Amino acid sequence: MAGELRIMENKSREDINLSPVSKIEIYSFFDPFSSDCFKLSAILSKLRIEYNQYIRIRHILNPSLKVLTKCQAQSTSNFDNIALAYKAAELQGRVRAERFIHLMQNEIIPKRDIITESMICDCIQNAGIDLEVFKDDLQKSKLTESLKIDLHIAREMEIEQAPSLVFFSEDVHEEGLKVEGLYPYHIYTYIINELMGKPIEKNLPPKLETYIQQQQLVTMEELLTIYEWPEKLLNKELKKLAIQQKIEKLKYPDGDFWKSKMPKIKSK
């Protein structure tokens, strides 16, 4: 489960000409086919909920040869190549692109890495992305150039595996901290608190019903991570929502999912 924590040289961010921000920047390098990356997405969702005013997360599909080769092998055209689809989604905003990849991971992991064009189209629309614009963007050669930029960033930060997170404080002259692999939630909160260097207040998560409506499709593991409730209590609350016809349970070989039956909340 655990990976490696190590300090990076401060040149990593400056060499790629990234402007400083007033928050902690977290670069998340992920593999859409990795179960550990799927688990980390729940942790990142919780971090964003609790520390939203202190952090900014940038998701980057790890452009390694292994990942890109698998993306190509799973596709029959640009329309079902998850790497190109993610870059095309980014052109309509990173928040929507992150929502898209979250929905795709919810589909990919339980279905044993199977990707179809219809699956991508459904996730694109559920993420609030204009489908026709997305299809046009998929035909543009600049997507490949964008992947090359991501590759440059990954090389500068010496990314060797996914998931990997790189934390930077607001001071561009400070060193970054790279966390390779998957760790318990408290490790990430400790890093954030240390980088802030002062007491910070956490936000509370939204109501369970609201969160599922926002995400549309969630796993038990994700909800247990977000809410930290006893599993028995969480199941009780989920059953209440199911009786109210607000959600439904979906069974997959790798676990149970809960799907919202409520109108989706549009991405901003």
From Swiss-Prot:
<dbReference type="InterPro" id="IPR046404">
    <property type="entry name" value="Adapter_SpxH"/>
</dbReference>
<dbReference type="Pfam" id="PF13743">
    <property type="entry name" value="Thioredoxin_5"/>
</dbReference>
<comment type="subunit">
    <text>Interacts with Spx.</text>
</comment>
<dbReference type="InterPro" id="IPR036249">
    <property type="entry name" value="Thioredoxin-like_sf"/>
</dbReference>
<comment type="similarity">
    <text>Belongs to the SpxH family.</text>
</comment>
<dbReference type="GO" id="GO:0005737">
    <property type="term" value="C:cytoplasm"/>
</dbReference>
<keyword id="KW-0963">Cytoplasm</keyword>
<comment type="function">
    <text>Adapter protein required for efficient degradation of Spx by ClpXP under non-stress conditions. Interaction with Spx stabilizes Spx and exposes the C-terminus of Spx for recognition and proteolysis by ClpXP. Involved in disulfide stress regulation.</text>
</comment>
<protein>
    <recommendedName>
        <fullName>ClpXP adapter protein SpxH</fullName>
    </recommendedName>
</protein>
